[in-house]
Protein backbone atom coordinates (compact mmCIF):
# COMPACT_ATOMS: atom_id res chain seq x y z
CA UNK A 1 0.00 0.00 0.00
CA UNK A 2 1.15 3.53 -0.70
CA UNK A 3 1.16 6.07 2.05
CA UNK A 4 -1.51 8.70 1.78
CA UNK A 5 -0.25 11.75 -0.04
CA UNK A 6 -1.95 14.99 -0.82
CA UNK A 7 -3.04 15.39 -4.40
CA UNK A 8 -4.46 18.87 -4.08
CA UNK A 9 -3.94 19.69 -7.73
CA UNK A 10 -6.35 21.30 -10.13
CA UNK A 11 -8.24 18.29 -11.48
CA UNK A 12 -10.81 20.01 -13.67
CA UNK A 13 -8.92 19.50 -16.93
CA UNK A 14 -10.23 16.79 -19.21
CA UNK A 15 -8.05 13.78 -19.97
CA UNK A 16 -9.12 12.39 -23.37
CA UNK A 17 -6.03 10.19 -23.78
CA UNK A 18 -6.64 8.20 -20.59
CA UNK A 19 -10.34 8.00 -21.36
CA UNK A 20 -9.75 6.85 -24.94
CA UNK A 21 -7.27 4.12 -24.02
CA UNK A 22 -9.54 2.90 -21.22
CA UNK A 23 -12.45 2.81 -23.65
CA UNK A 24 -10.43 0.83 -26.20
CA UNK A 25 -9.46 -1.62 -23.43
CA UNK A 26 -13.05 -2.20 -22.37
CA UNK A 27 -14.23 -2.43 -25.97
CA UNK A 28 -11.63 -5.11 -26.75
CA UNK A 29 -12.71 -7.13 -23.74
CA UNK A 30 -16.40 -6.96 -24.63
CA UNK A 31 -16.18 -8.11 -28.26
CA UNK A 32 -15.97 -11.92 -27.69
CA UNK A 33 -18.97 -12.21 -25.33
CA UNK A 34 -21.01 -9.89 -27.56
CA UNK A 35 -20.72 -12.23 -30.58
CA UNK A 36 -23.06 -14.96 -29.22
CA UNK A 37 -25.56 -12.29 -28.19
CA UNK A 38 -25.60 -10.79 -31.67
CA UNK A 39 -25.96 -14.22 -33.27
CA UNK A 40 -28.79 -15.06 -30.88
CA UNK A 41 -30.89 -12.20 -32.24
CA UNK A 42 -30.49 -13.56 -35.76
CA UNK A 43 -27.40 -11.76 -37.09
CA UNK A 44 -25.28 -14.49 -38.70
CA UNK A 45 -24.12 -12.99 -42.01
CA UNK A 46 -20.39 -12.28 -41.78
CA UNK A 47 -20.48 -8.72 -43.10
CA UNK A 48 -23.37 -7.68 -40.87
CA UNK A 49 -21.79 -9.36 -37.87
CA UNK A 50 -18.52 -7.53 -38.54
CA UNK A 51 -20.29 -4.16 -38.72
CA UNK A 52 -22.18 -4.93 -35.52
CA UNK A 53 -18.92 -5.72 -33.72
CA UNK A 54 -17.25 -2.55 -35.00
CA UNK A 55 -20.27 -0.57 -33.86
CA UNK A 56 -20.14 -2.19 -30.42
CA UNK A 57 -16.45 -1.43 -29.97
CA UNK A 58 -16.92 2.12 -31.20
CA UNK A 59 -19.86 2.75 -28.89
CA UNK A 60 -18.15 1.30 -25.80
CA UNK A 61 -14.92 3.17 -26.53
CA UNK A 62 -16.72 6.46 -27.09
CA UNK A 63 -18.93 6.25 -24.01
CA UNK A 64 -16.14 5.06 -21.70
CA UNK A 65 -13.75 7.65 -23.08
CA UNK A 66 -16.29 10.43 -22.59
CA UNK A 67 -17.09 9.40 -19.02
CA UNK A 68 -13.46 9.05 -17.90
CA UNK A 69 -12.16 12.05 -19.83
CA UNK A 70 -14.23 14.36 -17.66
CA UNK A 71 -13.10 12.64 -14.43
CA UNK A 72 -9.30 13.03 -14.06
CA UNK A 73 -9.42 12.01 -10.34
CA UNK A 74 -10.19 8.44 -11.47
CA UNK A 75 -6.75 8.11 -13.07
CA UNK A 76 -5.04 9.73 -10.06
CA UNK A 77 -6.80 7.41 -7.61
CA UNK A 78 -5.98 4.34 -9.69
CA UNK A 79 -2.34 5.38 -10.00
CA UNK A 80 -1.98 5.60 -6.22
CA UNK A 81 -2.46 1.85 -5.76
CA UNK A 82 -1.11 -1.37 -7.24
CA UNK A 83 -4.63 -2.00 -8.52
CA UNK A 84 -3.50 -0.04 -11.59
CA UNK A 85 -2.02 -3.33 -12.88
CA UNK A 86 -5.32 -5.19 -12.46
CA UNK A 87 -6.60 -4.43 -15.99
CA UNK A 88 -3.49 -6.04 -17.50
CA UNK A 89 -3.77 -9.09 -15.23
CA UNK A 90 -7.44 -9.56 -16.10
CA UNK A 91 -6.73 -9.23 -19.83
CA UNK A 92 -3.90 -11.78 -19.67
CA UNK A 93 -6.16 -14.29 -17.90
CA UNK A 94 -8.81 -13.51 -20.51
CA UNK A 95 -6.38 -14.36 -23.34
CA UNK A 96 -5.34 -17.60 -21.62
CA UNK A 97 -8.96 -18.67 -21.19
CA UNK A 98 -9.65 -17.81 -24.83
CA UNK A 99 -6.74 -19.95 -25.98
CA UNK A 100 -7.74 -22.85 -23.74
CA UNK A 101 -11.27 -22.81 -25.14
CA UNK A 102 -10.38 -22.69 -28.85
CA UNK A 103 -11.67 -26.20 -29.58
CA UNK A 104 -15.09 -25.55 -28.07
CA UNK A 105 -15.68 -21.85 -28.79
CA UNK A 106 -14.16 -21.50 -32.25
CA UNK A 107 -14.00 -17.92 -33.51
CA UNK A 108 -15.05 -16.55 -30.11
CA UNK A 109 -12.02 -18.19 -28.51
CA UNK A 110 -9.71 -16.87 -31.24
CA UNK A 111 -11.00 -13.33 -30.72
CA UNK A 112 -10.76 -13.70 -26.95
CA UNK A 113 -7.11 -14.74 -27.28
CA UNK A 114 -5.94 -12.02 -29.65
CA UNK A 115 -8.10 -9.23 -28.24
CA UNK A 116 -7.08 -10.34 -24.75
CA UNK A 117 -3.44 -9.81 -25.72
CA UNK A 118 -4.33 -6.40 -27.17
CA UNK A 119 -6.18 -5.53 -23.97
CA UNK A 120 -3.14 -6.71 -21.99
CA UNK A 121 -1.02 -4.07 -23.76
CA UNK A 122 -3.72 -1.43 -23.33
CA UNK A 123 -3.96 -2.34 -19.65
CA UNK A 124 -0.23 -1.75 -19.29
CA UNK A 125 -0.66 1.65 -20.92
CA UNK A 126 -3.50 2.44 -18.51
CA UNK A 127 -1.28 1.55 -15.54
CA UNK A 128 1.58 3.75 -16.73
CA UNK A 129 -0.70 6.69 -17.50
CA UNK A 130 -2.45 6.38 -14.13
CA UNK A 131 0.90 6.27 -12.30
CA UNK A 132 2.12 9.31 -14.25
CA UNK A 133 -1.00 11.28 -13.39
CA UNK A 134 -0.75 10.30 -9.73
CA UNK A 135 2.90 11.38 -9.68
CA UNK A 136 2.05 14.74 -11.24
CA UNK A 137 -0.68 15.27 -8.63
CA UNK A 138 1.33 14.27 -5.57
CA UNK A 139 4.44 16.27 -6.53
CA UNK A 140 2.64 19.44 -7.61
CA UNK A 141 3.85 22.37 -5.53
CA UNK A 142 6.38 20.34 -3.53
CA UNK A 143 9.83 21.75 -2.81
CA UNK A 144 12.64 20.11 -4.76
CA UNK A 145 15.68 19.12 -2.67
CA UNK A 146 17.93 17.89 -5.45
CA UNK A 147 17.85 16.09 -8.77
CA UNK A 148 20.21 13.98 -10.81
CA UNK A 149 20.25 12.42 -14.24
CA UNK A 150 21.92 9.06 -14.80
CA UNK A 151 21.77 5.90 -16.86
CA UNK A 152 21.87 2.31 -15.65
CA UNK A 153 25.12 1.01 -14.12
CA UNK A 154 27.22 -1.09 -16.49
CA UNK A 155 26.56 -4.34 -14.60
CA UNK A 156 22.79 -3.78 -14.71
CA UNK A 157 22.99 -3.00 -18.43
CA UNK A 158 24.74 -6.30 -19.09
CA UNK A 159 22.16 -8.25 -17.09
CA UNK A 160 19.28 -6.66 -18.98
CA UNK A 161 21.01 -7.36 -22.28
CA UNK A 162 21.66 -11.02 -21.44
CA UNK A 163 18.16 -11.66 -20.10
CA UNK A 164 16.46 -9.84 -22.97
CA UNK A 165 18.58 -11.65 -25.55
CA UNK A 166 17.85 -15.01 -23.94
CA UNK A 167 14.08 -14.37 -23.95
CA UNK A 168 14.15 -13.31 -27.62
CA UNK A 169 16.25 -16.35 -28.56
CA UNK A 170 14.06 -18.84 -26.70
CA UNK A 171 10.92 -17.26 -28.15
CA UNK A 172 12.28 -17.43 -31.71
CA UNK A 173 13.19 -21.10 -31.28
CA UNK A 174 9.76 -21.79 -29.80
CA UNK A 175 7.99 -20.22 -32.78
CA UNK A 176 10.16 -22.15 -35.25
CA UNK A 177 9.76 -25.50 -33.49
CA UNK A 178 6.03 -24.92 -33.08
CA UNK A 179 5.69 -24.20 -36.80
CA UNK A 180 7.67 -27.29 -37.83
CA UNK A 181 5.84 -29.70 -35.53
CA UNK A 182 2.47 -27.92 -35.67
CA UNK A 183 2.41 -27.13 -31.95
CA UNK A 184 0.04 -24.19 -31.66
CA UNK A 185 0.63 -23.58 -27.95
CA UNK A 186 4.39 -23.33 -28.47
CA UNK A 187 3.93 -20.96 -31.40
CA UNK A 188 1.58 -18.64 -29.55
CA UNK A 189 3.77 -18.65 -26.44
CA UNK A 190 6.81 -17.74 -28.52
CA UNK A 191 4.91 -14.94 -30.24
CA UNK A 192 3.97 -13.47 -26.87
CA UNK A 193 7.48 -13.78 -25.40
CA UNK A 194 9.32 -12.43 -28.46
CA UNK A 195 8.31 -8.76 -28.04
CA UNK A 196 8.68 -9.09 -24.26
CA UNK A 197 12.38 -9.78 -24.71
CA UNK A 198 12.85 -6.62 -26.76
CA UNK A 199 11.43 -4.61 -23.85
CA UNK A 200 14.48 -5.67 -21.82
CA UNK A 201 17.07 -5.13 -24.55
CA UNK A 202 17.36 -1.31 -24.39
CA UNK A 203 20.04 -0.61 -21.78
CA UNK A 204 21.15 2.97 -22.36
CA UNK A 205 18.07 4.77 -21.08
CA UNK A 206 18.79 7.82 -18.95
CA UNK A 207 16.40 8.72 -16.14
CA UNK A 208 15.97 11.87 -14.10
CA UNK A 209 15.48 11.46 -10.35
CA UNK A 210 13.92 14.33 -8.41
CA UNK A 211 14.09 14.23 -4.61
CA UNK A 212 11.39 16.22 -2.80
CA UNK A 213 10.17 16.38 0.77
CA UNK A 214 7.41 13.91 -0.10
CA UNK A 215 9.52 11.31 -1.86
CA UNK A 216 11.55 10.41 -4.91
CA UNK A 217 10.23 10.93 -8.42
CA UNK A 218 11.66 9.09 -11.42
CA UNK A 219 11.09 10.74 -14.78
CA UNK A 220 11.24 8.82 -18.03
CA UNK A 221 10.54 10.17 -21.53
CA UNK A 222 6.95 8.88 -21.47
CA UNK A 223 6.23 8.21 -17.79
CA UNK A 224 6.73 9.45 -14.24
CA UNK A 225 6.99 7.28 -11.12
CA UNK A 226 6.74 8.37 -7.50
CA UNK A 227 8.02 6.60 -4.38
CA UNK A 228 7.23 8.03 -0.95
CA UNK A 229 10.21 7.93 1.39
CA UNK A 230 8.58 5.24 3.52
CA UNK A 231 8.45 3.00 0.43
CA UNK A 232 12.25 3.14 0.17
CA UNK A 233 14.33 1.18 2.65
CA UNK A 234 18.00 2.06 2.21
CA UNK A 235 20.68 3.06 -0.26
CA UNK A 236 24.14 1.87 -1.22
CA UNK A 237 26.68 4.07 -3.00
CA UNK A 238 30.01 3.03 -4.50
CA UNK A 239 32.20 4.11 -7.41
CA UNK A 240 30.09 2.21 -9.95
CA UNK A 241 26.48 2.55 -8.86
CA UNK A 242 23.91 4.12 -6.59
CA UNK A 243 21.35 1.52 -5.53
CA UNK A 244 18.19 2.57 -3.72
CA UNK A 245 16.41 -0.41 -2.18
CA UNK A 246 12.61 -0.46 -2.22
CA UNK A 247 10.57 -2.25 0.43
CA UNK A 248 8.59 -3.90 -2.36
CA UNK A 249 9.67 -4.24 -5.96
CA UNK A 250 12.93 -3.96 -7.85
CA UNK A 251 15.71 -1.63 -6.70
CA UNK A 252 16.44 1.72 -8.34
CA UNK A 253 19.91 1.73 -9.90
CA UNK A 254 21.96 4.63 -11.27
CA UNK A 255 25.49 4.93 -12.67
CA UNK A 256 27.52 6.97 -10.16
CA UNK A 257 29.72 8.47 -12.89
CA UNK A 258 26.67 10.15 -14.47
CA UNK A 259 25.63 11.99 -11.30
CA UNK A 260 26.85 15.60 -11.26
CA UNK A 261 26.80 16.24 -7.50
CA UNK A 262 27.28 12.91 -5.75
CA UNK A 263 27.81 14.54 -2.35
CA UNK A 264 24.48 16.36 -2.43
CA UNK A 265 22.65 13.24 -3.56
CA UNK A 266 24.26 11.18 -0.80
CA UNK A 267 23.40 13.80 1.82
CA UNK A 268 19.78 13.89 0.64
CA UNK A 269 19.42 10.12 0.86
CA UNK A 270 21.31 9.86 4.17
CA UNK A 271 18.86 12.31 5.75
CA UNK A 272 15.93 10.07 4.83
CA UNK A 273 17.19 6.50 4.39
CA UNK A 274 19.62 4.16 6.09
CA UNK A 275 23.02 3.55 4.52
CA UNK A 276 23.80 -0.10 3.70
Where are these regions (language model features)?
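Short, flexible active-site loop motifs that bind/organize anionic cofactors or intermediates
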Residues: 206, 222, 255
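Acidic, Ser/Thr- and proline-rich intrinsically disordered linker/docking segments
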Residues: 140, 230, 234-276
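Short charge-dense sequence patches
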Residues: 179-187, 214-224, 258-260, 272
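Phosphoinositide-dependent membrane-docking surfaces
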Residues: 211, 216-218, 224-242
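Eukaryotic intrinsically disordered, low-complexity regulatory linkers and tails enriched in Ser/Thr/Pro
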Residues: 1-206
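Short, highly charged, low-complexity non-transmembrane loops/tails of multi-pass membrane proteins
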Residues: 138-150, 213-220, 262, 271
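Short beta-strand element of the conserved SAM-dependent methyltransferase core
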Residues: 131-133, 211, 244
Amino acid sequence: MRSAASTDRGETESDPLFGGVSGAYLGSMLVPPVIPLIERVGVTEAGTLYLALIGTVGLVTTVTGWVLSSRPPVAVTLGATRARWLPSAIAFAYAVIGFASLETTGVVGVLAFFLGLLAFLLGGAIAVMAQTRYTAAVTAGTEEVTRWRASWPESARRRRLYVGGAVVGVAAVGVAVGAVFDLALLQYTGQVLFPSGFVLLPTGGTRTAVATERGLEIRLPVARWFYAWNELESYDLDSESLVITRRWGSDLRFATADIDDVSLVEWTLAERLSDD
